[in-house]
C-alpha cells in the first residue's frame, strides 16, 4: 500500500510512449542493463564538421540558464568524471561492439513475439546490496484482448529465500484515461527494521519476514499538461515473522537486547481495505519540450482493518511542492522540492508499522537509506535534484535530500535531528512497469549524533514492480 508518489516519477519527465514500440523500448532497457549497458557512447563518434556561418552573423550569446550550468558542473565534477569515464564510456564501447555484431536485433527478435512484436518474455535481474537479489522474468502483451488492453507480469525470487510475482492489466481508453487492475504476492524473510523514530541507529539493524498479498484497481485521469487525478481501491493482507539475512539478527532477537520494542502489528499482521486519492497540478509539458515548470500535489490513503479487534483504521496523507528549471532547454533539469508526509490513526487500534510514514529505498524520498530505514508518524524532506539525458530512454540523476521522520504531525522536529541523503545514478524511463536502475547512495546519522555517514546503498538491474 504505497501512499506517496515521488515528485520526479511523473509522466512529464518521460519520453512520449509509442504503443508499437513499447516492447522495443522495454527490451532495450533490459539488454542495456544485462548485456550492453544503458548509455550510448560518444567516445568513438567522428568529429563534427563546424557549422558554416550562412547568415554572416556571430552565434547568439549564451542564455542565463547556459551560464548557470557551470555551477553544478564545478560542484559535481568529481561525480561526473566517475560516471563518465568509469561507467558510461566503457559500457558505451561494449554497446558499439554489440551493435556492430547485430546482437540487439538478434536478441530483440528472440525474446519478442508476433508480427508487430507486441508480446514477449524477458529475463530480468536486480541487485540491491543489503537484501537478497532477484532473478526472474518479465512478460508483456500489448493489445492483448482488445486495443488498449495491456498485460504485464513479473515472476521473481531468489532460490530458497524469497518469491514474488505480480499481474497487471492496464486498459487505456481512447480519451487517454486508464484503468489498472493489479494483483501481487510476495514472501521474503530479509526486510530490514531499525526501530521507530528519528534517532534510530544503523547498528540496530534487524530482519523480519513478510507474507503479503495485495489487489487493487486504480483509475488515472490525465488533465492539463502533466496534471492528473488518480483514484483507487484495494485489499491488502500482510503477516510478519522473525526474519534472517546472512549474520544479521532477527527482529525478535534484536528486540530482546533492548534496542527497540516490537512494533505494532508484529507478528499478527493485518488485513485491510484501502482507498487512495491523488490530485496533481503540474505545469510541465511532455517530452520533447523543455522540462521547466511547477508541480503541486496532495494525496491520501485511508485504510480500514478487517475483522480486527479493537477496531483499527488509519489515514496516510501528504503534500508536496516542487519547482523545475530546464537550464538549457534540452531536459537538463534542476529541481527543488519540499514534501511532508503524515500517518494518523482513525480507530482505537494502533497503526501497523508497515503503514507508518517511511523514508528510504527506491520509491520513498531519501534513497541513500535502506527501505524502511526511517519510520514514524510523520516526515519532512527537502530535495535538490539534477537530472539530465544520457542516451535513448536513459537519464542521469544526482540528488541531495535533507529530512527525517518525526512524531505525530512533526512533533519533536528539531534541526539537529535532520539527516542527509545523497545519491547518483542512471535510470531508464521507457516503461512504468520495469525500468533499468543504477544507484549509488549514502545516508547519515542525525546532525546531533555527529552527522557521520552510516548507510550505503548500491543497486543495479531491472526493477520488478514489487
Residue ranges with predicted function:
Residues 1-22:
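N-terminal secretory signal peptides that target proteins for export/translocation
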Residues 114-123, 131, 153, 206, ...:
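C-terminal outer-membrane beta-barrel translocator/porin domains of Gram-negative envelope proteins
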Amino acid at each position: 500500500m504505497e501512499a506517496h508518489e515521488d515528485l520526479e516519477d511523473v509522466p512529464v519527465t518521460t519520453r512520449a510512449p509509442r504503443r508499437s514500440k513499447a516492447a522495443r523500448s522495454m527490451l532495450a532497457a533490459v539488454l542495456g542493463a544485462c548485456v550492453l549497458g544503458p548509455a550510448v557512447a560518444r567516445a568513438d563518434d567522428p568529429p563534427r564538421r563546424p557549422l558554416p556561418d550562412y547568415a554572416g552573423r556571430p552565434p547568439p550569446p549564451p542564455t542565463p540558464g547556459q551560464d548557470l550550468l557551470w555551477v553544478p558542473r564545478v560542484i559535481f565534477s568529481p561525480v561526473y568524471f566517475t560516471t563518465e569515464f568509469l561507467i558510461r564510456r566503457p559500457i558505451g564501447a561494449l554497446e558499439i561492439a554489440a551493435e556492430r555484431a547485430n546482437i540487439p536485433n538478434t536478441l530483440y527478435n528472440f525474446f519478442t513475439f508476433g508480427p508487430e512484436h507486441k508480446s514477449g518474455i524477458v529475463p530480468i535481474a536486480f541487485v540491491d546490496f543489503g537484501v537478497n537479489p532477484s532473478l526472474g522474468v518479465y512478460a508483456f502483451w500489448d493489445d492483448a484482448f482488445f486495443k488498449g488492453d495491456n498485460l504485464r507480469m513479473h515472476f521473481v525470487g531468489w532460490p530458497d529465500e524469497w518469491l514474488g510475482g505480480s499481474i497487471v492489466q492496464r486498459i487505456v481508453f481512447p480519451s487517454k484515461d486508464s484503468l489498472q487492475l493489479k494483483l501481487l504476492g510476495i514472501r521474503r524473510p530479509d526486510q530490514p527494521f531499525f526501530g521507530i523514530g528519528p534517532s534510530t541507529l544503523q547498528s540496530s539493524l534487524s530482519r523480519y519476514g513478510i507474507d503479503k498479498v495485495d489487489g487493487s484497481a486504480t483509475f488515472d485521469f490525465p488533465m492539463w499538461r502533466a496534471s492528473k487525478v488518480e483514484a483507487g481501491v484495494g485489499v491488502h493482507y500482510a503477516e510478519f515473522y522473525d526474519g534472517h539475512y546472512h549474520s544479521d539478527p532477527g527482529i525478535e532477537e534484536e528486540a530482546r537486547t533492548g534496542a527497540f520494542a516490537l512494533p505494532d502489528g508484529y507478528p499478527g499482521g493485518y488485513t485491510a481495505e484501502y482507498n487512495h486519492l491523488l490530485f496533481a497540478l503540474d505545469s510541465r509539458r511532455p517530452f520533447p519540450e523543455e522540462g521547466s515548470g511547477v508541480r503541486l500535489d496532495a494525496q491520501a490513503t485511508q485504510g480500514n482493518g478487517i475483522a480486527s479487534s479493537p477496531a483499527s483504521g488509519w489515514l496516510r496523507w501528504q503534500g508536496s511542492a516542487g519547482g523545475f528549471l530546464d537550464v538549457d532547454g534540452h531536459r537538463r533539469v534542476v529541481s527543488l522540492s519540499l514534501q511532508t508526509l503524515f500517518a494518523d490513526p482513525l480507530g482505537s487500534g494502533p497503526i501497523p508499522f508497515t503503514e507508518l510514514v517511511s523514508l528510504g529505498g527506491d520509491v520513498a524520498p531519501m534513497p541513500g537509506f535502506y527501505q524502511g530505514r526511517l519510520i514514524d508518524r510523520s516526515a519532512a524532506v527537502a530535495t535538490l535534484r539534477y537530472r539530465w539525458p544520457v542516451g535513448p530512454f536513459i537519464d542521469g540523476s544526482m540528488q541531495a535530500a535533507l529530512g527525517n521522520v518525526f512524531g505525530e504531525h512533526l512533533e519533536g522536529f528539531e534541526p539537529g535531528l535532520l539527516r542527509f541523503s545523497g545519491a547518483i545514478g542512471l535510470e531508464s524511463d521507457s516503461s512504468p512497469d520495469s525500468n533499468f536502475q543504477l544507484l549509488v547512495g549514502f545516508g547519515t546519522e542525525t546532525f546531533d549524533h555527529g552527522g557521520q555517514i552510516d548507510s550505503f546503498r548500491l543497486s543495479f538491474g531491472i526493477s520488478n514492480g514489487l
